[in-house]
Amino acid sequence: MKFIDRVKIHVKAGDGGRGCLSFRREKFIPKGGPDGGDGGRGGNIVLRVDEGLGTLLDLRYQIHYKAQRGAHGMGKNCHGKNGEDLEIRVPPGVLVYDAETDELLADLTEGCHELVVVRGGMGGRGNARFATSTNRAPRHVQPGVEGEERWLRLELKLLADVGLLGMPNAGKSTLISAVSAARPKIADYPFTTLVPNLGVVRCGGFKTFVMADIPGLIEGASEGHGLGTRFLRHVERTDLFLHLVDLSDLQEGDPMERFALINRELARHNPELMEKPQLVVLSKIDVSEVRERLDAVRAAFAAEGIRTLAISAVTGEGLKELVAEVARELEKLRASRLQADQKAAEEDEPWQPDLS
């Protein structure tokens, strides 16, 4: 399936139905009076989260969406039927912007599962509504109000617990395929991964976490080099970064420098990303040359106060320890977040006098 994470669509709510001009016509009632009904309300357009979707592909090929208009009013005081709402299903994690003003309308995550983006117009009033003591036969009716319309820009940010960082060919796709059921394309050339991939990792019992693999970063990515930072927004929601450093390619320079380079590009894209905790993972330790220099590299990171984990996604060495460490870190982060939320809730409680 093609991965689409940004689309622009036009939405038009339904117009309200027109009020009816009608007079009561019955035998033996020569002056029955007005009986024109009101028009129906136009339908709204609603964005609704569908947990089964993971891309905006369906919206790529249909740009214009129009809800049903309200039915016109009828005689005998019959009101027109309201137009049906039109639902547009989107994956969780979509940011909804007004395309003309760039205003953020909503973030459709777990806390917000639907959003009315445009509302239908009200139906017009029939002539029965305008009858007065001095005007027994009004011939005035109201047209329906036009429904709202606007251009929207939808941007998808994947929802994941752990994001994988690293240069191209660092082994990110191999890692996610080794610890989950995800099957991204894997090859021995840079930029094999062209779109983000998600994988669900089981860490014992019923506990799981979601890992996101994005295309690798290179120097100048914040300026658009390589694949740029287009896909970095997909790891902005993650709680933890796994920063993979490939030790097998000696031509790429010092591992510490490559580690710092990725962090510089990350900071240029969004300084807030640097506040997220990182676990540094030294990859491809199954290669003999890597074994020889592994201790020296770990010592260099340790001198900077950076703890490292060593793995081989091919042989499986170190993967069990890595998954366990990630699970522990996520548990700590969730516990601290829960504690902060409880503290904030206690501070928001209104003061009450002690009556004891």
Swiss-Prot record:
EC number: 3.6.5.-
Function: An essential GTPase which binds GTP, GDP and possibly (p)ppGpp with moderate affinity, with high nucleotide exchange rates and a fairly low GTP hydrolysis rate. Plays a role in control of the cell cycle, stress response, ribosome biogenesis and in those bacteria that undergo differentiation, in morphogenesis control.
Names of the cofactor(s): Mg(2+)
GO BP annotations listed: ribosome biogenesis
Family membership: Belongs to the TRAFAC class OBG-HflX-like GTPase superfamily. OBG GTPase family.
Residues annotated as binding Mg(2+): S173, T193
Limits of the Obg domain: 1-159
Amino acids binding GTP: 166-173, 191-195, 213-216, 283-286, 312-314
Ranges where the OBG-type G domain occurs: 160-331
Quaternary context: Monomer.
GO cellular component, one term: cytoplasm
GO molecular function terms noted in the UniProt entry: GTP binding; GTPase activity; magnesium ion binding
Principal location listed in the UniProt entry: cytoplasm
Name of the molecule in the record: GTPase Obg
Keyword terms: Cytoplasm, GTP-binding, Hydrolase, Magnesium, Metal-binding, Nucleotide-binding
Superkingdom of the organism of origin: Bacteria
Organism: Syntrophotalea carbinolica (strain DSM 2380 / NBRC 103641 / GraBd1) (Pelobacter carbinolicus)
NCBIfam families given in the database record: Obg_CgtA, PRK12296.1, PRK12297.1, PRK12299.1
Subcellular location: Cytoplasm
